[in-house]
Amino acid sequence: MARTTPIARYRNIGISAHIDAGKTTTTERILFYTGVNHKIGEVHDGAATMDWMEQEQERGITITSAATTAFWSGMAKQYEPHRINIIDTPGHVDFTIEVERSMRVLDGAVMVYCAVGGVQPQSETVWRQANKYKVPRIAFVNKMDRMGANFLKVVNQIKTRLGANPVPLQLAIGAEEHFTGVVDLVKMKAINWNDADQGVTFEYEDIPADMVELANEWHQNLIESAAEASEELMEKYLGGEELTEEEIKGALRQRVLNNEIILVTCGSAFKNKGVQAMLDAVIDYLPSPVDVPAINGILDDGKDTPAERHASDDEPFSALAFKIATDPFVGNLTFFRVYSGVVNSGDTVLNSVKAARERFGRIVQMHANKREEIKEVRAGDIAAAIGLKDVTTGDTLCDPDAPIILERMEFPEPVISIAVEPKTKADQEKMGLALGRLAKEDPSFRVWTDEESNQTIIAGMGELHLDIIVDRMKREFNVEANVGKPQVAYRETIRQKVTDVEGKHAKQSGGRGQYGHVVIDMYPLEPGSNPKGYEFINDIKGGVIPGEYIPAVDKGIQEQLKAGPLAGYPVVDMGIRLHFGSYHDVDSSELAFKLAASIAFKEGFKKAKPVLLEPIMKVEVETPEENTGDVIGDLSRRRGMLKGQESEVTGVKIHAEVPLSEMFGYATQLRSLTKGRASYTMEFLKYDEAPSNVAQAVIEARGK
């Protein structure tokens, strides 16, 4: 099969927003105008197409980023058909992992803001993630029909709160119930959408007389921004020459692709105004797969040689699995983004991260949760594969004859855990199966069995994250569970280097004995300096311990790291240097050296000033001014460190760093302090040493 859409006419975009900015309605309208979806789904009555899990429809928040394909030829049919692949991203802080995951595979993004609420704390988190992956973006200021809507105020917040350089492409004509359309600042015309056909058709009209002066001022601002793209254009502009529409658009596109400016559009998705022009801006200004740098990877040659893949059908096949979803009809769906080459259903590919081969059984393209089966996918495509056996989020799929590992995704460690048990014994096996599937879908969610209590423990990024997991078990797998009290994921580490710690395991009473003897140094590592949080250096000279036993020493220590001597929590940021020891020709074995290493580890750990680390959360509270004192007082009682506050239109925004252990039940307390008028967001920031009284209480509670 030949390629149907040239790759330069692809746009792989994400639509990202704070909860309640109207992102779901915006996506729905995109599907409507691109002709995929003929009845507009409203999130107000739970019928939206993109939000395909029951839960999302009930809570009105988007949890899983579904990928949808749509085609657009422009409001005035001015382009050849462009293929837009939309990755829907969640807006709640407990799901930032989903956002991060989708940012990896996007080429561009549309940031949706509410014209009333403006830039919210969650918008800042998403913004940082987009910066991290250098994603070019444009903004859409939605809900211009709401009370208190103010387009230019939001433009200013994009500048002050996000540190970006916003350039309006449009101005709103009227606001609140008087919002009727937009001024196109490139064409210098008003756009008036036809209410009778839900905004499918439109007219260009003259700019309203009372807006001409303002429009000229912002048109000038737009032209200046365009002129800064090159010296040539700047000279032309300064020489008093008019820039053509092509020159303006080309220059603005260049600056968006370089992440120098954010073009801002506006509208009301609910009132069918503005989404159409925003789609034109996606085509005009956001990158195709060939406009972004080639993806980097490493060759599977044992030397980690850097390599790259360009967005071309002629290069070897390479793709990144960015999401695993469980589908009620077909089982596992693996969403993947193709960076290079072509793959057909029935082909065998290599999962280079796991060094395993996988066969592409069926390939489907998703439209929200409806699917269309396709035979092949090419560079730039986003699709889902059915029937892959052992693929996890972040794995690379590639041509077995040209193996490459694309940049790995990094996922944060969970910070909160709870014990779960099925309400009936009969559900035990079903629960294990359900949790296993959910953990495969979501790398920021973990599940394990506590060896001492034999309880099943689930861990995630926040209380809401775990609530939703428990809820999904009930809905999708029909397993009802009782949930324990949330537990904090503490860590242990050392603060001091200790040298020449000896560990000896010797049993030589008749018959074959056991003998292993090691001497190690232990030392603290800079937090975050080693992604594993542990390093092992083999410094054995002259074969005092034979090479075949060295991995056993490393393994013996790694097993001890899982449950530290202090309170049984994982040990992090620690290095081991093995530099001496002895062995016995007959009695030495791997097991003996493993045991010797664990004896040395326990001995050394006690002497190395062990400390307990606790997760610290970055907390932002928005509260009415009159409650500021109460909120700050309450955060201080929770051992919070105040990091600053600023005045907002809606009240005061307080920034603090608070230990997670003190944040349980905070939502309820904040509601009662402020009569429900305050809101807060919380995300993991870092691990820090717990004060001795807190550490003591934790250690005693663990019975150590």
From Swiss-Prot:
Modified residues (N6-acetyllysine): K504, K643
Residues involved in GTP binding: 17-24, 88-92, 142-145
UniProt KW keywords: Acetylation, Cytoplasm, Elongation factor, GTP-binding, Nucleotide-binding, Protein biosynthesis
Domain of life: Bacteria
Subcellular location: Cytoplasm
GO biological process: ribosome disassembly
Cellular component GO terms held in the UniProt record: cytoplasm
Keyword GTP-binding part of the UniProt annotation: yes
Presence of keyword Transmembrane: no
MF (Gene Ontology): GTP binding; GTPase activity; guanosine tetraphosphate binding; translation elongation factor activity
Domain tr-type G: 8-290
Family to which the UniProt record says this protein belongs: Belongs to the TRAFAC class translation factor GTPase superfamily. Classic translation factor GTPase family. EF-G/EF-2 subfamily.
Role this protein plays: Catalyzes the GTP-dependent ribosomal translocation step during translation elongation. During this step, the ribosome changes from the pre-translocational (PRE) to the post-translocational (POST) state as the newly formed A-site-bound peptidyl-tRNA and P-site-bound deacylated tRNA move to the P and E sites, respectively. Catalyzes the coordinated movement of the two tRNA molecules, the mRNA and conformational changes in the ribosome.
NCBIfam families given in the database record: EF-G, PRK12740.1-5, small_GTP
Protein name (Swiss-Prot/TrEMBL): Elongation factor G
Organism (species): Escherichia coli O17:K52:H18 (strain UMN026 / ExPEC)
